Design a protein with these regions (language model features):
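Short C-terminal tail/terminal secondary-structure segment
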Residues: 2-5, 145, 224, 235-248
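Conserved glycine-rich cofactor-binding loop
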Residues: 20-21
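Substrate-binding pocket helix/loop in short-chain dehydrogenase/reductase
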Residues: 97-110, 204
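Active-site helix of classical SDR
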Residues: 121, 156, 164
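Residue(s) in the substrate-gating loop at a strand-loop-helix junction
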Residues: 140
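Short, small/polar-rich loop/turn modules that mediate ligand/substrate recognition or access, typified
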Residues: 172, 177, 234-236
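C-terminal helical subdomain
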Residues: 180, 199-234, 243
Length: 248
């Protein structure tokens, strides 16, 4: 391996689940910029439905609508490649207003944030194995601490850590490397409920040693590293990308 070429993904295929906006979209575009052919699974009917949506840039990316909360939809989902070199599972949801304290809301969040990860992972396993590919699962720093108003979010993200470790061990014999990323407070549409309030934002920044919000590009950099030959001897790990917030 030449280190200068380690982030060249030319000729490789990448699927980003939940890549229509936010962190997932940033990851998809980063792989495209590094030469990969990238396909996105999202929730809207077509790529054109994301035109003008904040944090969404599907230019140069393939797209399919897939409801990852529905196992039958995942089983039938189109993947336009014979094999996959990298799969990123970045789907996620959260409910505010104490919605996760209701049984229905709790189940909905866990289904998307945890159960669908296993559903999607099983769907792509046979396509990753021939390429000895990389599976990346996006968790959260919420896996390591209480998220007071969001019990389902915290529980599902903590469960993701166990899933990453277990799949990494189970699939290592297939040559599939499984790792995760735990982002902290990233400036996306999903976090606007907090970041649009100056006083609340200031309190949050006071807990981040780097004194800034993360950007989707910060998470994308971690994804490129973990999927590259630079990380060829790393499995079952979850890389924290949080500006140091877990240190305080």
């Amino acid at each position: 391996m030449g280190y200068g070429d380690a982030l060249d993904f030319s000729g490789l295929t990448v699927l980003v689940v939940g890549g229509s906006s936010g962190m997932g979209n940033g990851i998809g575009q980063a792989f495209r910029e590094c030469g990969a052919t990238v396909h996105i699974w999202g929730t809207r009917a077509g790529a054109e439905d994301y035109a003008g949506v904040e944090g969404s840039d599907l230019s140069g990316l393939g797209y399919s609508q897939v409801d990852v909360a529905d196992p039958s939809a995942v089983a039938a989902a189109m993947v336009p490649f014979e094999q996959l070199d990298v799969v990123v599972l970045s789907q996620g949801t959260v409910l505010y207003g104490r919605g996760e304290f209701q049984t229905e809301g709790f189940a909905r969040v866990v289904n998307v944030n945890l159960t669908s990860l296993m559903t999607c992972a099983m769907r792509v396993r046979a396509m990753l194995a021939p390429a000895r590919g990389s599976l990346l699962i996006i968790s959260s720093t919420g896996a390591f601490r209480s998220t007071k108003g969001n019990p389902a979010y915290a529980a599902s993200k903590a469960g993701t850590l166990g899933l990453i470790r277990t799949l990494a061990e189970a699939w290592a014999t297939d040559g599939i490397r499984v790792n995760g990323i735990a982002p902290g407070l990233i400036d996306t549409k999903m976090t606007e409920v907090s970041t649009k309030h100056p006083e609340r934002l200031r309190r949050m920044l006071d807990e981040i040693p780097l004194d800034r919000l993360g950007k989707p590009e910060d998470v994308a950099g971690a994804a490129l590293f973990l999927a590259s030959p630079l990380a060829s001897y790393i499995i079952g790990q979850t890389l924290v990308v949080d500006g140091g917030s877990l240190l305080s």
